[in-house]
């Protein structure tokens, strides 16, 4: 399905497609594995943004619009005849949400469910008033990355590894900073799909409740033990996949 999408377990006859959007600086491999965790009724498609993995020679995206445009151009034919859902963690929560909004506004299409993780709603007040992480100097930026967690020590302690790791991360953080500061809460919810927020209990506080203002559909919050990258813990990852699977089973019975 194009260089944008990594699908380890292609299932053309699946009833539902789960599209997973990467965290800042992330690639597609973590989510592509999920295809092996779901049954034959679900096809997992992991988004691969420019500047990483097989797209490492391509320039990074410069704006949220650029990401949305590419995702929709590639995915639109796959979205028009089959149920689909979105999942996004951290930066991926914003890219998946923004893509869902554009799909509904321009094409009348909407995911059956939006799963967002590890992120405040884009109109959360403190996001608009906090210091832009993309404007931190290299030392401060690395200190912030370390505080968030999730980055292996062998990368943080290796200068050459950091030279490969930090550029895509910083590029995504620039997109994030510009997106949240230009986002104004709409007068009415832009989405009508169900929305679930996942979060780690030890992560920094997120304004999860504000996500409810962005959809007229069902809304719930589900927390798991751990910090910002709680989903990298095998037990949490299993719980996350189980939660999504149960929702998809219910959706498929109603198709």
What are these regions (language model features)?
Residues 1-87, 94-255:
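Domain-scale detector for complete catalytic domains at protein termini or as standalone homologs
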């Amino acid at each position: 399905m194009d260089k944008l999408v990594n699908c380890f377990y292609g299932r053309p006859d699946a009833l539902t497609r789960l599209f997973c959007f990467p965290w800042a600086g992330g690639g597609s491999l973590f989510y592509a594995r999920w295809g092996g965790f779901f049954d034959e009724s679900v096809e997992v498609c992991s988004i691969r943004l420019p500047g990483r993995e097989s797209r490492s020679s391509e320039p990074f995206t410069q704006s949220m619009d650029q990401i949305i445009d590419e995702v929709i151009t590639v995915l639109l034919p796959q979205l028009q005849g089959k149920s689909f859902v979105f999942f996004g963690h951290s930066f991926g929560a914003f890219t998946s949400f923004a893509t869902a909004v554009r799909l509904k506004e321009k094409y009348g299409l909407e995911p059956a469910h939006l799963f967002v993780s590890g992120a405040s709603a884009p109109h959360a007040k403190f996001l608009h008033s906090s210091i832009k992480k993309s404007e931190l100097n290299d030392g401060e930026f690395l200190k912030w990355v370390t505080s968030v967690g999730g980055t292996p020590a062998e990368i943080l302690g290796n200068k050459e590894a950091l030279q490969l790791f930090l550029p895509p991360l910083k590029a995504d953080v620039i997109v994030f900073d510009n997106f949240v500061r230009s986002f104004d809460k709409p007068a009415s919810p832009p989405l009508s799909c169900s929305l679930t927020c996942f979060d780690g209990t030890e992560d920094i506080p997120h304004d999860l409740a504000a996500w409810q203002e962005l959809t007229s559909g069902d809304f719930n919050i589900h927390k798991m033990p751990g910090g910002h990258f709680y989903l990298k813990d095998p037990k949490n990852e299993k719980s996350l996949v189980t939660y999504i699977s149960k929702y998809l089973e219910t959706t498929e019975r109603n198709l």
